[in-house]
């Protein structure tokens, strides 16, 4: 008896070449249902409809098509098992040797802003995953394909094996099939969990492997990058440069989060986008600035600390212009990310073949979701991203002297930066430019010393931001000794009064935000 291939796909790409090869080259009978059968018939291929084979019509508007013993018996039966063979003969069931199924586009459906509950529910596939799981379970005898990108692999292997599907390939395809159905069910569970806001649900996600990286943070560590296509960095387009590394991705993430504080879009002229640039090393910023255009912002960000910028990562929140590209070309950098690059900028930067240029559109960022996930031994920590809007109207003036208009602007700028610096974090800034950044010290005054020393004489007339409260008045007094005129911090220390008193004695303005921004 001729081998049988069952084909039932929502994505018709590559279907006809596969079906033609199975039938005309390898002699397969084609069994199909619904729209897939119609496509095959229109192409002139002989096909038996599932409803004809089972003797049962499609019912419930297509909800039940393939859920039938003649389908699943043919998939699950063990070849060479006498009892199974007898059951098939008694029920007039044929072996099914190849199953080609891809599932209703649930993830794509629920990603639409205007999707309704009923539309989402109707795109939950039932028969498809059931056939995939049956075929994957019986991979000793059955090959299962769930994606068009597997079709050529199957046909090439069959051509080399005289029409047979090698056992190793069947096993690999079974693995991919179970991964596919697991990811599909996870997507449904995630959507429904968010829709009904269930408390205590397990955190589920199935993220496909995008790339095996050269190594991890260090050469002796293996690393892999998992990402959904078109979501977050999975939606970035690398225009040129070497392969991305683990450290590149970590630094890009940090740089992007910070530059988005000032808006992010493909057109730097958009009112919501204040042209800004960020330079990052080891996930900490070494220079951040805003400007009248992205070129000015970039120059100011680099001027904040040109020594540390060497080998850094740059993020820009608007179109990279020719002028900005000229500045970038003069430096040794690892990566530059922006919503887009002008043709002139691309031409200028093409001379730096190893420089990684990435275009990342706002839509890909928005599709990435709100969860921040980190691993710990034997588990995960999942929290909301610390990306709530800055609300100066909710801040409190704690000092006798309120900040001046310029100080207020500088304090807002510094507060946007400090939540992206590793705790304990201190930022010294003035007129839309970071001047000194103190990160990761075990005591707050230690971070303040680093930031103030980096700012040097420029600290005079500048402001200082702290991601956590001042536990003592030492940071305020140190800041004043370097010429700082205003400070901002969350407040909440038992000794807040001491720091406020020091500000009043020394003539500093102090704002309390009421919100801490630790970063570990």
UniProtKB/Swiss-Prot annotation:
<keyword id="KW-0378">Hydrolase</keyword>
<dbReference type="GO" id="GO:0006189">
    <property type="term" value="P:'de novo' IMP biosynthetic process"/>
</dbReference>
<dbReference type="GO" id="GO:0005829">
    <property type="term" value="C:cytosol"/>
</dbReference>
<dbReference type="InterPro" id="IPR036914">
    <property type="entry name" value="MGS-like_dom_sf"/>
</dbReference>
<dbReference type="GO" id="GO:0004643">
    <property type="term" value="F:phosphoribosylaminoimidazolecarboxamide formyltransferase activity"/>
</dbReference>
<protein>
    <recommendedName>
        <fullName>Bifunctional purine biosynthesis protein PurH</fullName>
        <ecNumber>2.1.2.3</ecNumber>
        <ecNumber>3.5.4.10</ecNumber>
    </recommendedName>
</protein>
<keyword id="KW-0511">Multifunctional enzyme</keyword>
<dbReference type="InterPro" id="IPR016193">
    <property type="entry name" value="Cytidine_deaminase-like"/>
</dbReference>
<dbReference type="Pfam" id="PF02142">
    <property type="entry name" value="MGS"/>
</dbReference>
<dbReference type="InterPro" id="IPR024051">
    <property type="entry name" value="AICAR_Tfase_dup_dom_sf"/>
</dbReference>
<feature type="domain" description="MGS-like">
    <location>
        <begin position="1"/>
        <end position="146"/>
    </location>
</feature>
<keyword id="KW-0658">Purine biosynthesis</keyword>
<keyword id="KW-0808">Transferase</keyword>
<dbReference type="Pfam" id="PF01808">
    <property type="entry name" value="AICARFT_IMPCHas"/>
</dbReference>
<comment type="similarity">
    <text>Belongs to the PurH family.</text>
</comment>
<dbReference type="GO" id="GO:0003937">
    <property type="term" value="F:IMP cyclohydrolase activity"/>
</dbReference>
<dbReference type="InterPro" id="IPR011607">
    <property type="entry name" value="MGS-like_dom"/>
</dbReference>
<dbReference type="InterPro" id="IPR002695">
    <property type="entry name" value="PurH-like"/>
</dbReference>
<comment type="pathway">
    <text>Purine metabolism; IMP biosynthesis via de novo pathway; IMP from 5-formamido-1-(5-phospho-D-ribosyl)imidazole-4-carboxamide: step 1/1.</text>
</comment>
<comment type="pathway">
    <text>Purine metabolism; IMP biosynthesis via de novo pathway; 5-formamido-1-(5-phospho-D-ribosyl)imidazole-4-carboxamide from 5-amino-1-(5-phospho-D-ribosyl)imidazole-4-carboxamide (10-formyl THF route): step 1/1.</text>
</comment>
């Amino acid at each position: 008896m001729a081998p049988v291939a069952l084909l039932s796909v929502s994505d018709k790409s590559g279907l006809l070449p596969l079906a033609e090869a199975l039938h005309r080259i390898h002699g397969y009978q084609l069994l199909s249902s619904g729209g897939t059968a119609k496509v095959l018939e229109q192409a002139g291929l002989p096909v038996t409809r599932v409803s004809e084979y089972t003797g049962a019509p499609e019912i419930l508007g297509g909800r039940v098509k393939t859920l039938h013993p003649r389908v699943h018996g043919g998939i699950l039966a063990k070849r060479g098992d006498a009892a199974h063979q007898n059951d098939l003969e008694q029920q007039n069931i044929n072996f099914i040797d190849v199953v080609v199924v891809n599932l209703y586009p649930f993830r794509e459906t629920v990603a639409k802003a205007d999707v309704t509950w009923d539309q989402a529910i109707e795109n939950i596939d039932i028969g498809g995953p059931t056939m995939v799981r049956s075929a994957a379970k019986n991979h000793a005898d059955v090959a299962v394909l769930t994606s068009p990108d597997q079709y050529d692999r199957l046909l090439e292997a069959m051509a080399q094996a005289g029409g047979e599907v090698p056992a190793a390939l069947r096993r690999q395809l079974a693995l991919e099939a179970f991964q596919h159905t697991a990811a599909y069910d996870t997507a449904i569970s995630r959507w429904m969990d968010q829709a009904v806001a269930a408390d205590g649900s397990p955190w589920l996600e199935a993220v496909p492997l995008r790339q095996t990286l050269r190594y991890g943070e260090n050469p002796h560590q293996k690393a892999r990058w998992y990402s959904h296509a078109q979501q977050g960095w999975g939606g970035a387009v690398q225009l040129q440069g070497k392969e991305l590394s683990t450290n590149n991705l970590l630094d890009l993430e940090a740089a992007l989060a910070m530059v988005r504080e000032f808006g992010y879009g493909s057109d730097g002229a958009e009112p919501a986008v204040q042209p800004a640039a960020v330079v990052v090393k080891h996930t900490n910023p070494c220079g951040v600035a805003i400007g009248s255009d992205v070129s000015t912002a970039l120059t100011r960000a680099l001027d904040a600390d040109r020594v540390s910028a060497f080998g850094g990562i740059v993020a820009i929140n608007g179109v990279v212009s020719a002028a900005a590209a000229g500045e970038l070309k003069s430096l040794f950098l690892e990566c530059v990310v922006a919503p887009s690059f002008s043709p002139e900028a691309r031409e200028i930067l093409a001379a730096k073949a190893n420089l990684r240029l990435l275009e990342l559109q706002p839509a890909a960022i928005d599709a990435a979701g709100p969860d921040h996930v980190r691993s710990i031994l034997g588990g995960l920590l999942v929290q909301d991203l610390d990306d709530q809007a800055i609300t100066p109207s909710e801040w409190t003036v704690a000092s006798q002297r309120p900040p001046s208009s310029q100080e207020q602007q500088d304090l807002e700028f510094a507060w946007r930066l400090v939540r992206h610096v590793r705790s304990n974090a201190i930022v010294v800034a003035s007129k839309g430019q970071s001047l000194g950044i103190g990160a990761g010290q075990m005591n707050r005054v230690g971070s303040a010393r680093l930031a103030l020393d980096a700012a040097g004489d420029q600290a005079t007339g500048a402001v200082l931001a702290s991601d956590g409260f001042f536990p003592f008045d030492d940071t305020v007094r140190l800041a004043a000794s370097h010429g700082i005129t205003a400070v901002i911090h969350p407040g909440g220390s038992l000794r807040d009064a001491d720091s406020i008193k020091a500000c009043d004695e020394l003539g500093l303005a102090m704002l309390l935000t009421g919100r801490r921004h630790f970063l570990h």
